[in-house]
A protein has these predicted regions:
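Short glycine-aromatic motifs
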Residues: 29-35
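Small/polar loops that bind or transfer phosphate-bearing groups
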Residues: 17-18, 53
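Short, Lys/Arg-enriched N-terminal segments with co-localized hydrophobic residues
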Residues: 2-9
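Short N-terminal binding/cap micro-motifs at the start of the first secondary-structure element
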Residues: 21-26, 60
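Helix N-cap/beta->alpha junction signal
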Residues: 19-20, 149
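Extreme N-terminal starter segment of soluble prokaryotic enzymes
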Residues: 10-14
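Glycine-rich phosphate- or other oxyanion-binding loops that anchor nucleotides, phosphorylated ligands
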Residues: 35-238
Length: 242
């Protein structure tokens, strides 16, 4: 207590994604800036929220985390964004608060903090097609796959801060999509112009890509709603403790 008033600490929450589209509904009215190739959005109410994206893969996720930490340390972090489903029963376009993350490269397992859901997610070094999804499901017992979450989980563990993982399903197990890996640059950025030229002359992919676009939009909306509800519940619990 200082001068007869309570001093309330501001919680600094980081939200790390791969692509701006994943964050769009969440950060629509937030302040945006670009720092060294990383897109950063900030919002302040009673607490401070910082979202960032730098591309696909663990190296890009690490750069995004570093950009968020540039001003000050963070108190908790979310890995956030689109994922593929590894089972048919998972809702395409829906959001999941995962139980934990497995790194397919190292076998490491990271638990999410209290309040997380039931599904496990595996982080792959590549975009998984149907065959790879089936292999990952069998090898790790996970329901979801991404390319970044393990890096964020590891960084959170090193800093001893709470880690959460909220993901939205953009593509189901049986989705027949182009090989996205050939259009991801060394920096993790998706080379959209090359991809458009590729699919423009391959109409067999058009229906599935249209479905994926719509599912991705729904997933982004669902993630924003899930994150907002989760943070409201968490902040309410902390207020009761105080």
């Amino acid at each position: 207590m200082v001068s007869g008033e309570w001093v309330c600490a501001v919680t600094r929450t980081a939200i790390i994604a791969a692509m701006a589209g994943e964050l769009k509904p969440l950060v629509r009215w937030w302040k945006h800036e670009r720092m060294d190739g990383v897109d950063v959005w900030k919002h302040r109410d009673d607490n401070l929220y910082v979202a960032a994206c730098a591309g696909a893969g663990q190296a890009a996720a690490t750069r995004a985390f570093a950009a968020v930490e540039r001003d000050a340390p963070v108190d908790l972090v979310f890995s956030y964004g689109w994922v593929g489903a590894l089972r048919e029963d998972l809702t395409v376009g829906g959001a999941y608060n995962t139980a934990g993350v497995i790194d397919a490269r190292t076998g490491e397992r990271f638990n999410c903090d209290a309040g997380a859901g039931a599904e496990w997610l595996v982080t792959s070094p590549v975009v998984a097609d149907e065959r790879e999804k089936l292999r990952l499901a069998g090898a790790y017992g996970a329901g979801l796959v991404d390319m970044e979450a393990a890096a964020i989980a590891r960084l959170a563990q090193m800093r001893q801060i709470p880690f959460y993982c909220i993901k939205g399903v953009s593509d189901g197990l049986g989705a027949r999509l182009p090989d996205f890996n050939r259009f991801i640059g060394a920096d993790g950025r998706f080379e959209l112009a090359r991809f458009v030229l590729f699919v423009l002359v391959r109409p067999k992919y058009w229906p599935e890509l249209i479905r994926m676009g719509e599912n991705s939009r729904k997933a982004s909306e669902a993630m924003a709603k899930a994150l907002s509800e989760f943070l409201e519940g968490r902040e309410g619990t902390e207020s009761e403790v105080r």
